């Protein structure tokens, strides 16, 4: 089944911070690299003011699609609705250049869409035969006999521990004897024109697959869910495309369009939606992105499957298509999601010529789980989707069986659901080398600078070089030969054919036939006219002359993709121009105002049962007796764990009903944003015995806080904890039990199972192996120190070495530990010598005594060595084999310390004594102030840091070795600190992660700001020269109010990133505008006091920033400037009735970003747009408008003010203003807002020039 990929011309919309202009322009200004000697598409807020209906449509799309839906058809067969017996012309006009193809020019880039194109079907195909004579009158095609191998059915069987031998032939008995029939006479229709060709391009009879009765599929596993799917004949939805232009595109290891299989994932998030998952992925694609998401209702493809994604680790990414299953919560939705996934997987396998082959049990095949990749290939440590599937009483084997069945149905090997038999089997979509189909086409294309050349026939092995690049041509035919697709391009105006080009060598767009019109428009002087619609800089017919708007008389119109182009005359010059540059001079016909829909009430209440737990934040809105209360009552029940029994939604607010965990006492309703919430499963009774360390805290509730301690474990040595109850909170297990007469809850992480001989348990033959990756198969950077035991198993150069080398020479010595890796059931660490620099090898941790190693801290102190001491050592915590001076040699001497470090609970000092340097335990020294391991009291500390080390951990308690969790998912995200504590010279911060959980993190894993530097590959002189040489010169005000052309030195000074980065205010032009900072709602509301309708809208700005990935301050500054600090009528709201603005209506529509508020009538146009978008509250206008802003420059790659102004990736193109100080002015404004809010910018992206 062939994928139909098309291109579109989106309007890239940008909103200025200074001067409220809305700018729209053609895609070539935004997406293509242009001739940089003269700027063809530089935009200025003073020059262009119109936007397009395309931008409006994008705002309403719930998944931010840049396209519609995708239809899969067969890439090898195109079946005709018309079979014209015309003879093709083999000798096309060859306007080619025999020189080599110029590969130096950068290729055009174009945004893509997937507007569905009907694919006609053919009942006959022809294959090449090298010894067939071909006449000049026909295409250079050859003929061959059709080989029908489909009668021998070989269904794909599930790989499992025991495969039934008889399954291989279960479908063969039903295979009919081949019969030969004549092709039916073709009907002639207008479109689409599709012709199949023989050697003479005449219709012929072919061996057709006979009508036959197909066998029904025999399931290989029992599955009530699969039976439900079959019984209800569930249909998969159309595949939607939601591609993102800034995702990277890299080939698989075997090349573009050559994946080796598909991987099953699940999102591991019970509370997310498919839109939420996609939005989160787009904002964090640098960490991971996948090809598609599937839930019970939709299949959304988020990245082209011809290119790899980052979803399954370094080994699997270059091989497989990655698809995520979004969690559903009821039987029917889960069944639909499995049906949708199986259908999508079978479609991909069929499309890429792959057969279903489970890799689950042998590590070989085309259908993988993430667990299988972790187990057999490595590079990742995940075990999904088995846990999620088991939670629905489903398994991977059942899903694979469904994929296999879907594939066989699509291949025409078994009967579809709901039928006893079927007609001719559908043609397998694996391309057959040599089969050709040709179809009529009505489109346009531009040949990229780097291409394979022009082909006289599609059978030519190589193309001839051409200079006809970066020009728009008409496309008259499409041909598919095997897995290669070609377009026949011709001169748009004369029809002269140039030749065939490969699909990948062009930027293609659909086109409708031109229509005659008779319409007058006004057009600005300087606007370019082109010889063809969607013309390029090489096809300019002239520019509009005169001063002031001129009259353009249009006589022809054509739609290219979704853009309209008109052909006409102005001041004696004729040519094509985009309708976006024209203004209709005719009096507009009033459009009837649609009957306003009933606004959604904000008082609609929904209540549902819930089983969870929550802790009320210290800062909160209080407890509510009912969710209708306007204000809550203050409460002291903060930072305690309560049970949650219900959740309620009222308008835009969500509440939880909290109660005492151990009694039926209700506490009250709390707002969702005022708690840290976790899912909880119902408690279950257990009878288990564990050991627990003395001092371990017991709590009155699971996931209890310091305010809910029930006591601490007493005694010496491990104590016996008898558990009687167990409950899962989120992903953690808590047990209730008794130890030494005290009862309470404790996390399972603090318990150990007493050693006991294991009883062998007989397993049924059909048992499925447990799907748990016990330890991460990744290497972690650590800071530890270890002593090698005398009796050890040896040293390894790699953890993969089965046999270790003798480690006797390392025994009884201390070494630094820098790396740690789990391999199988064993854990290994990498030892380094005492200089830290040279790795020695890997030891099993069982052969070592290991302690944490702190950070070295400088000190200047004199000490007296105690009479009884352990000597001067080469390394902290050194053994007798590493002593430099014995205890007798340094006793009573003076030790001059220069640095110190903590080893576990001890402190060692490095210094000099008797002209020798080394380490001494602090316990062996006496000083005026004794050096001891210190733990300072935790103190309040409010600051938002950025997590910079994805390989680090966050902790439940500081310095804990057990209760720690990876920071990988939170890397480069904000961390709001509320407390600080120093333990053994290590500073720890306690605060809130981006998911709302509270944790401790080391200061070394945090940064005050995250600055990334990107190399441009050009010098500052080069880019300044390009900017200074533009047709529309950069502007500067040397005298206030008077604009003049900036010279080279002015431009170079304005673009100097090194200078700008040193200025505390100008540095903000490098602030990433596509990265929210999680600024607290309280701070935002304080800043918005007195700002008109924007007052108290902090929650809306916070939601908008998180939902669409936009910096909060950038959004706020936009809104303040557009609305005059929240006081404009557009912001305060109005209605449009009978095409007139009504400001006193009951329902008002708000527009706080000035979207679509065109200069000719900004209030009416802006309110009309808000009404269409449904923005009947200020908060809706904020959130909805943020999506519009996010889809403009911010998401188009120009995500800083500097990039908007100077576009360092493609200097001189797609730039936002001509004023060289534009970025400086706006940087100072944003810095000023940050200062008023009391925050600083966290994420900066600075270009660097050579």
Curated annotation (Swiss-Prot):
Q: Assembly and partners?
A: Oligomer; forms a ring structure at the cell surface which is important for efficient partitioning of daughter cells after cell division.
User: Mind telling me which GO cellular component terms the entry cites?
Assistant: extracellular region
Where is each GW domain found?
437-511, 513-587, 606-680, 682-756, 778-853, 855-930, 937-1011
Q: Which family does it belong to?
A: In the N-terminal section; belongs to the N-acetylmuramoyl-L-alanine amidase 2 family.
GO terms in the biological process aspect are: cell wall organization; peptidoglycan catabolic process
The primary site where this protein sits is secreted
Q: What modifications follow translation?
A: Undergoes proteolytic processing to generate the two extracellular lytic enzymes, probably at the septal region on the cell surface.
Q: What is this protein called?
A: Bifunctional autolysin
Q: Where are the annotated segments for N-acetylmuramoyl-L-alanine amidase?
A: 199-769
This entry's Enzyme Commission designation comes to 3.5.1.28, 3.2.1.96
This chain's source organism reads Staphylococcus aureus (strain MSSA476)
One GO molecular function term of this record is:
amidase activity
Q: Where is the composition biased (Polar residues)?
A: 103-138
Q: This protein's superkingdom?
A: Bacteria
Q: What UniProt keywords apply to this chain's record, in alphabetical order?
A: Cell wall biogenesis/degradation, Hydrolase, Multifunctional enzyme, Repeat, Secreted, Signal
Q: List the catalytic activities from the record.
A: Hydrolyzes the link between N-acetylmuramoyl residues and L-amino acid residues in certain cell-wall glycopeptides; an N(4)-(oligosaccharide-(1->3)-[oligosaccharide-(1->6)]-beta-D-Man-(1->4)-beta-D-GlcNAc-(1->4)-alpha-D-GlcNAc)-L-asparaginyl-[protein] + H2O = an oligosaccharide-(1->3)-[oligosaccharide-(1->6)]-beta-D-Man-(1->4)-D-GlcNAc + N(4)-(N-acetyl-beta-D-glucosaminyl)-L-asparaginyl-[protein]
Q: Where is this region: Endo-beta-N-acetylglucosaminidase?
A: 770-1250
Q: Signal peptide: which range, if any?
A: 1-29
Which gene is this protein's source? atl
Q: Which residues cross the membrane?
A: none
Q: What does this protein do?
A: Endohydrolysis of the di-N-acetylchitobiosyl unit in high-mannose glycopeptides and glycoproteins containing the -[(Man)5(GlcNAc)2]-Asn structure. One N-acetyl-D-glucosamine residue remains attached to the protein; the rest of the oligosaccharide is released intact. Cleaves the peptidoglycan connecting the daughter cells at the end of the cell division cycle, resulting in the separation of the two newly divided cells. Acts as an autolysin in penicillin-induced lysis.
Its localization reads:
Secreted
| Annotated InterPro entries | Amidase/PGRP_sf, Amidase_domain, GW_dom, GW_dom_sf, MGlyc_endo_b_GlcNAc-like_dom
Composition bias, Low complexity: 173-196
